């Protein structure tokens, strides 16, 4: 990844050239007498140092043995469009796989720590994507054997809301659709570009967790590329009507645990699993056979859960065998 090394070199030069690295302020005590300078860090310089640390973490993660064995690639890295790095990580052969999922994570996700951990580790959103790939039992890693292949993109091409923005009540908080709406056109363009550059016509799945599912909903309004959509822990996908999202009703799935208060809210267009007019099919989260129950807001793609198997069946382009018995999508 020569261009990543170039970005690191360029940022090192920016840091070396940046002035002033600190701010000096003259302080005169009341009543006169000797004054003195106080020196404080320059916030812009400190922000640049943090971005260099992030960039180094990204490089270490992608060059790790684990990433090489998983065939991970850096598809997007943008340092200019928002407050944080925006990135997209590929797992598997994105250009040639039969089945491709584009997964958009939600609130508090950043490029690092997030998609990429510290000290060469991998963040949980990428692991969530790869849990789905593993459970699909399709070939996706270099050396995997199988007639059908799969790949996933963990897409963070937007500024996901964080707790600071939410507690301050800004319009970039999770209580506002602003960031999801801003993400929509870029994510739609990514879907379209992936389909156009793919060798053959892939089975393309749009996937999203939490606030990322809302961004997914805005993207679906602007792209016809995805064949299926599956969301989990969703506060709403902008609409529960298939025609609004450009989808067929039997290609829309959603997952919500019984104690996920985010999914219960239906804040952005209604709850896909409980709205009476929803075209989404609700997938089961209860224990079934050897599969365990999912609880809360963040366990949907945990290994061994019923919800993970249901989601992976969507990636395989199969009708899920784990449909909630109260699903409003069952006719």
Name each region found by the language model.
Residues 1-98:
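Intrinsically disordered, low-complexity charged segments of secreted bacterial virulence
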Residues 10-13, 25, 162, 218, ...:
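Residue-level detector of solvent-exposed, low-hydrophobicity positions
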Residues 20, 29, 38-39, 213, ...:
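Intrinsically disordered, low-complexity regions enriched in small/polar residues
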Residues 47-51, 62-65, 73-80, 120-128, ...:
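Short linear motifs at secondary-structure transitions and domain/linker junctions
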Residues 82-84, 211, 234:
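Mixed-charge, polar/low-complexity N-terminal
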Residues 92-96, 106-202, 220-331:
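Lipolytic serine-hydrolase domain surface
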Residues 207-216:
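Gly/Ala-rich beta-loop-alpha elbow adjacent to hydrolase catalytic centers
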């Amino acid at each position: 990844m020569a261009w990543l090394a170039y970005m690191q070199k360029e940022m090192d030069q920016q840091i070396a050239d940046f002035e002033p690295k600190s701010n000096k302020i003259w302080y005169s005590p009341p009543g006169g007498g000797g004054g003195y300078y106080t020196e404080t860090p320059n916030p812009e310089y400190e922000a640049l140092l943090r971005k260099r640390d992030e960039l180094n973490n990204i490089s270490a993660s992608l060059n790790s043995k684990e990433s090489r064995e998983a065939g991970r690639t850096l598809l997007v890295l943008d340092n200019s469009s928002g407050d944080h790095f925006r990135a997209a990580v590929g797992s598997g052969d994105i250009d040639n796989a039969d089945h491709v999922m584009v997964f958009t994570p939600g609130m508090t996700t950043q490029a690092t720590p997030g998609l990429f951990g510290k000290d060469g580790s991998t963040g949980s959103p990428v692991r969530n994507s790869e849990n789905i790939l593993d459970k699909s039992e399709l070939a996706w890693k270099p050396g995997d054997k199988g007639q059908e292949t799969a790949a996933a993109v963990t897409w963070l091409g937007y500024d996901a809301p964080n707790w600071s923005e939410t507690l301050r009540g800004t319009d970039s908080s999770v209580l506002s659709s602003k960031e999801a709406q801003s993400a929509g056109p870029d994510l739609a363009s990514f879907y379209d570009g992936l389909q156009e550059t793919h060798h053959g016509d892939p089975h393309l799945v749009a996937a999203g967790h939490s606030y990322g599912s809302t961004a997914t909903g805005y993207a679906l309004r602007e792209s016809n590329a995805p064949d299926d959509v599956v969301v989990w822990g969703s506060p709403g996908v902008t609409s529960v009507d298939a025609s609004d999202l450009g989808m067929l009703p039997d290609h829309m799935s959603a997952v919500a645990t019984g104690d996920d208060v985010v999914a219960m809210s239906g804040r952005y267009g209604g709850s896909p699993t409980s709205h009476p007019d929803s075209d989404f099919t609700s997938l089961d989260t209860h224990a079934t056979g050897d599969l365990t129950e999912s609880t809360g807001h963040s366990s949907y793609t945990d290994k061994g859960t019923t919800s993970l198997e249901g989601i992976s069946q969507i990636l395989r382009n199969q009708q899920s065998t784990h449909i909630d018995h109260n699903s409003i999508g069952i006719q």
